[in-house]
Amino acid sequence: ECVALLCDNDGIPDSVERRMKIFFGIMEKAKQYGIAPSRLHIDPLVVTLGTDQTALTVFADCCRRIKYEYPEIHITSGLSNISFGLPVRKNINQAFMVLAMNAGMDSAIVDPTNKNMIGMIYATNALLERDEYCLEYIGKFGNKAAEEAAQPAPASPLDEKMQKVFKLTQDGKNKEIGQAVQEALDNSF
């Protein structure tokens, strides 16, 4: 197996065209060394969205072009690079994962203990027809449905805030209700 990055001595190219030029150079070297395309893991290199609004589109376009030229090549990425410097990074990371997988990415550097991200990967594979009859998804989560049905849903922070509003209303503490409602609204997203 071989991992190759689409960068050169000048750094990470801004354009898809320059990255693809590097990609074709990598393919020439792989051919010289007898490395089959199926053993290559190409990282098109995603940059942070906070400094480059085209971060996803350049990455996704590279993925699509690579998969068009060599469907058997694997595409990987350091997932959290896209969200560097942004607040609530997990939101950006999860959205990026889905969009990148749709463009052809089939592996990524992720936190294996992040259950939401792992669930997103299984669900996305099922939706993209990469999981025949959802067998992998069912195998991973089939028993979870029964377990979750038996467990009461945990209270969300919003539920707790609204309980406070309800209690203040019951107790007739009108002066405090406005602030409690505002706190609930501020923390609802």
Give the role of each language-model region.
Residues 43-47:
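Active-site pocket-lining segment
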Residues 1-38, 48-69, 73, 80-189:
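ATP-dependent carboxylate/acyl-activation modules
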